Regions:
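Structural preference for beta-rich elements and adjacent junctions enriched in aromatics
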Residues: 2-229
Length: 229
């Protein structure tokens, strides 16, 4: 996280949050690479979480990366720099969004309104749901089995990251899609978020801006676009 690319992204982030409108109105696109093995993440495009909303002066730099790992599923890497991240919850389906939390929302089937939300704190504690809107959500786990989350320990409590794997078998169960669905040019939608509803400093940042008057990440109309390469 401390490389020159991270520093450059962080400088751009400071400029963007100063105005908050720098993200623009057009949904952003992220081009998803298909790889044979766990990649060198320095070679994978970064989605900066540089749009902020709903007030407050505290800002956290975050970024996300997404790849299709052949014969396995999708891997999502989430990183942030944050002073003293809060991680109180330790059991599945706890309200981890109240901790220092990073989130991945995604509608993998371009022909369905259903989307998956995976929310994780700095300990890797996970909340995973599926549905068509905020009020239509059900537990997305299978008998308590959730997508594996690897926590990359934060150094001196100033940065932390997560590596989430969503297997194809899970996507087939939830969306009816398979590995063969994700051919080059296939498009689907989603967003990346960083929040801390009840942390020491409440904050909300995201990849694609959510333009609602009050905090609400369950807004698929504001999702960005993922394009398979």
């Amino acid at each position: 996280m401390k490389g020159s690319a991270m520093s450059q992204q962080k400088e751009e982030f400071v400029l963007n949050v100063a105005a908050c409108d720098a993200c623009g109105e057009t949904p952003r696109k992220y081009f998803v690479h298909s790889v044979k093995a766990v990649p060198d993440w320095n070679t994978i495009p970064v989605a900066p979480l540089d749009c902020c909303a709903w007030g407050g002066s505290y800002r956290v730099y975050g970024q996300a990366q997404l790849v299709l790992l052949r014969d396995v599923g999708f891997m999502c890497r989430l990183q942030c720099e944050e002073q003293a991240p809060v991680a109180r919850y330790q059991t599945y389906f706890s309200p981890v969004y109240q901790d220092s939390c990073m989130e991945f929302f995604c509608a993998f089937d371009q022909n369905s309104e259903k989307y998956l939300n995976v929310e994780m704190n700095a300990k890797g504690t996970c909340l995973c749901e599926i549905g068509t809107n905020r009020h239509d959500r059900v537990d997305a786990s299978e008998n308590g089995t959730v997508p594996p989350v690897k926590v990359e320990p934060f150094a001196q409590r100033t940065s932390w990251s997560l590596l989430l794997t969503i297997p194809f078998v899970t996507l087939t169960r939830l969306f009816g899609v398979t590995q063969e669905t994700f051919v080059p040019g296939y498009q689907f939608r989603g967003n990346f978020y960083k929040c801390g509803d009840a942390s020491t400093a409440t904050h909300y940042t995201m990849w694609n801006p959510v333009r609602t008057p009050t905090p609400d990440f369950h807004q698929p109309s504001f999702f960005g676009t993922f394009v398979m390469q």
